[in-house]
From Swiss-Prot:
Assembly behavior: Component of the RNA polymerase III (Pol III) complex consisting of 17 subunits.
Native organism: Candida albicans (strain SC5314 / ATCC MYA-2876)
Entry keyword annotation includes Nucleus: yes
Gene that this sequence comes from: RPC82
GO biological process, any: transcription initiation at RNA polymerase III promoter
Protein name: DNA-directed RNA polymerase III subunit RPC3
Length: 595
């Protein structure tokens, strides 16, 4: 991609800049041009893409096939003109961003073989199980083992069945379903057109949800039984479920927040609780919210998200108890006395013969008396290595998560049964990280002013001075920096009908959602900038890097000392940039959560 096209992608939007850069790095020049044009112009045919990019139609079509397979492009055939239209699909491009993290996580949680399966699926976009297992035909036991690993990954929702709707844009699918439902809803003299459209819309929502859930629920077209053993059908085509990995990222974010606010051991308990319900937890993307014009009011959006969460709670899919999470806790950590409950009762008088427990005689069935100790026994279960995990202690940790801080990290729906308020915690997570960023970048005074503005919602300079206990000069200076960073907005309030400047005063306010979106766009832009920086210094030293590839393993003999030093500097520079990229990516993942 030439400099003009890259500059156009950079100026257009942060997402355009990042996605074009990713396509250039992983897929080549033609793919990056196609993605850039689709972001700029929306849905286009292959001929229209060819005319705008000046690339032959034949090359465009062959590139589109690969992009569709890698989940980077949607296609749709119109019924009227029978033409194929293509639009951008973000899933494949996001998989390029997270691919390394996905493989590392699967390797840690499952093993090398499972990571290899996921890696092959990420490379090819989707895989037919039968085709993948042909490489193990020489070893029947290994083939059975691989089949079981596919089944485990599918049951844990890392793999899902590839459906037709995965290749089509949600807008096109919704429009088609809605038109069908509208035709099936007859006009009536006693029913208004508004009510008829609302009925058709309600039916279309049910149909769309049924269609989207069909790939994750087990059915006759997914599973089969061989010798009494459940297996996936050999002709089943599976693809990776990005939403499942994003749930894992949400789990990590919640655990880190608990670790910083309460402590390490409570965070371990919370991690076990989240992992227990992670697979069935609320989705990371809500299809109905992505359809323009369907749910517009912010209150309706919030109610819709909460209704899905409450439905999962009522179905007991995201509820747990101390006994449920007990087996998921690490065996090498002793939780005994990890929660100290102070009591103000007077200490009991010590026994005369020391601290030995009282002995009590119990008459057995055979008439022989047996002495037993009356020392207090706890309801604990002992693991294989002797570590005692006390259910009472786990309950205390859960109570600490419920009442230990101003934030309720769990909700108790019935005695001993808990759930996690995902939507509420997501908003708190974003707020906490945003305030931490303001404090780290702009200082303590800016942080105090931000908290003051948030508490008063709409205030002037004098109110901020009184609330934050700062001088007027300091407040004015910090407000300038906060406004420049788009953290605080100015509200002009005229005192006269002619809006004279001399009679106008200004108020300040903070809007969380707009700030989060602005920060998210900044993070996307920074990720693209880092990737471009890496590519730029690789191009600057292209000859040296090609020479290194030719003599790899014998560079000490064929390269000069200054070349070796420069090569080492390039490697360190790339590592530093990749570390920055990972940090920004982790922060971007937080603000991509839907609350």
């Amino acid at each position: 991609m030439d400099e003009v096209q890259m500059e156009t992608a950079r100026i257009q939007s942060p997402k355009s800049y990042l996605y074009t850069t990713l396509a250039t790095t992983h897929l080549g020049e033609i793919a990056s041009c196609i993605i850039s044009i689709l972001i700029s112009n929306g849905r286009l045919t292959a001929r229209e893409i060819s005319n705008r990019t000046k690339i032959p139609t034949k090359n465009i079509k062959s590139a589109l096939v690969s992009l569709i397979q890698l989940n980077c492009i949607y296609y749709w055939q119109e019924e009227k003109d029978r033409k194929f239209y293509y639009s951008l699909k973000e899933t494949g491009l996001l998989l390029f961003v997270y691919s390394g993290d996905i493989i590392n996580h699967i390797k840690r949680q499952y093993g090398e073989d499972e990571a290899e399966i996921i890696q092959n699926i990420l490379i090819h976009g989707h895989v037919k199980i039968e085709d993948y297992l042909t490489q193990f035909n020489h070893d029947k036991s290994m083939k059975i083992d691989q089949e079981n690993k596919f089944l485990k990954l599918f049951n844990d929702n890392w793999l899902i069945k590839l459906q037709d709707y995965h290749f089509h844009s949600l807008d096109d699918i919704w429009h088609k379903i809605f038109e069908e439902c509208l035709k099936d809803t007859p006009r009536s003299s006693v029913t208004s057109e508004i009510k008829r459209v609302a009925e058709a819309q309600a039916k279309a929502k049910v149909k769309l949800n049924t269609l989207l859930e069909s790939g994750t629920t087990g059915g006759g077209d997914i599973f089969t039984e061989v010798n009494g053993m459940k297996k996936l059908k050999p002709d089943l085509v599976v693809t990776f479920n990005l939403s499942r990995f994003q749930k894992h990222l949400r789990t990590n974010a919640f655990v880190n927040m608990v670790r910083s606010k309460i402590g390490v051991l409570t965070a371990i308990v919370y991690d076990a609780a989240l992992r227990y319900i992670e697979n069935k937890s609320p989705p990371m993307d809500y299809p109905l919210l992505d359809i323009p014009g369907l749910i517009n009011d912010p209150k309706d959006v919030k109610e819709y998200i909460l209704s899905i969460e409450n439905k999962l709670v009522n179905e007991k899919k995201i509820t747990f108890s101390a006994r449920d999470i007990q087996r998921l806790l690490p065996k090498d950590i002793d939780f005994k006395n990890s929660v100290i409950t102070p009591t103000f009762a007077k200490p009991k008088r010590p026994l005369e013969n020391g601290s030995s427990p009282t002995l009590k005689k119990i008459k057995l069935e055979d008439g022989i008396a047996s002495s037993t100790s009356t020392s207090t026994s706890t309801s604990s279960s002992t693991s294989s290595n002797g570590t005692s995990i006390d259910l009472n202690t786990l309950e205390q940790h859960l109570k600490l998560l419920l009442n230990g801080t101003n934030t309720a990290f769990v909700n108790e729906i019935s005695p001993g049964n808990y759930t996690i308020p995902f939507s509420h915690l997501t908003n708190i997570l974003k707020q906490n990280n945003f305030e931490a960023l303001v404090k780290a970048t702009l200082g303590d005074y800016a942080f105090r002013i931000l908290r003051c503005v948030k508490s008063m919602k709409l205030c002037d300079e004098k109110s901020i001075c009184n609330g934050a206990l700062l001088k007027e000069k300091t407040v004015r200076s910090e407000l300038y920096h906060l406004i420049k960073a788009n953290i605080i907005e100015i509200q002009e309030v005229p005192r006269s009908a002619d809006r004279a400047a001399s009679k106008t005063f200004y108020l300040f306010r903070h809007k969380s959602n707009s700030n989060f979106n602005y920060l998210k766009n900044c993070l996307i832009y920074d990720m693209a900038e880092i990737l471009n920086r890496i590519q730029d210094f690789k191009l600057e030293h292209k000859i040296l890097l090609e020479k290194y590839k030719l003599v790899e393993g014998q560079e000490d003999q064929y390269l000069l000392d200054r070349e070796l030093k420069l090569l080492n500097d390039l490697q360190l520079r790339e590592i530093k940039n990749l570390v920055k990229f990972q940090r920004i990516k982790s922060l971007y993942s937080l603000y991509s959560l839907v609350d």
